[in-house]
Amino acid sequence: AFSIPATVTGIVLVIIGALVIVGGLKRIAAVTEKLVPFMAIAYVIGALIIFFANISHVGAVFTAIFKGAFGLKAVGGGIVGSGVKLALTWGMKRGVFSNEAGLGSSVMVHSSSNVKEPVRQGMWGIFEVFADTMVVCTLTAFAVLSSGLIDLDTGAVLVDVSGSALVGQAFATVFGSFGPAFIAIAILLFAFSTVLGWSHYGSKACEYLFGTKSTIVYKIAFVLMIFIGCTMNLGLAWDLSDTFNGLMAIPNLIGVIALSPVVMKITKNYVARIIKKEDVKPMLSVFPEIQEEQEKAM
């Protein structure tokens, strides 16, 4: 949107990232944390404005989505199954990249929250996935598909852009030149806050595995990877992301399945106490020491 070379962007982000991640300059992180929620709200409002501006296209857009996703146009060719498989594959890849469901990453943040009811915090985790995927992603898809930039019959993109630039052009159909600039700034803030979040995740994992002293090596390597991420081929970046997301999901999902009975017990206890108002002893953790600590806090 601003014609800034990727190399320059990478160098600037490496410097800022180093100040925050390695140097501990929290002021930049604090400003980012305050700006991101406002940008997210502004993005949703902007997408809603596009939605209502093109509301007459709702039927055509959702018809095109289902036809394209599930291969309804190819029923005669007998490849509906292939279309469904492709839709599920790409849906899961991009869904996991967007909402991190099943990766176990957001647990690090949720577990550090100061709440008395773990079930309530877990519900916020579920809500995040719904809001991200069902609300934000759906609004984004509608904004792009209803903008006239894509042929709904063939799926062909009618402009010479793709990815986030396509979203910027979709916003430009309603907001003019402000649209691409807004999307560029929003993505920059979202991406930078994500970088800070994942640096924390990795640092904690490295500390657990190799000790506190190892985190400085990790942080330096992480900051250098910011530049590589800014300049590398986008297709390779997606492939690496999908691969490592899958590798993270495998052990985490095994843990989720193994701990499901415990989660069910704690959830049923919460429903009985809070919703049904039954007089039962709170079950707040499977670990006795944490259970005792939480009971005292209540």
What are these regions (language model features)?
Residues 2-23, 41-42, 180-185, 214-232:
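Transmembrane alpha-helical segments of multi-pass small-molecule transport proteins
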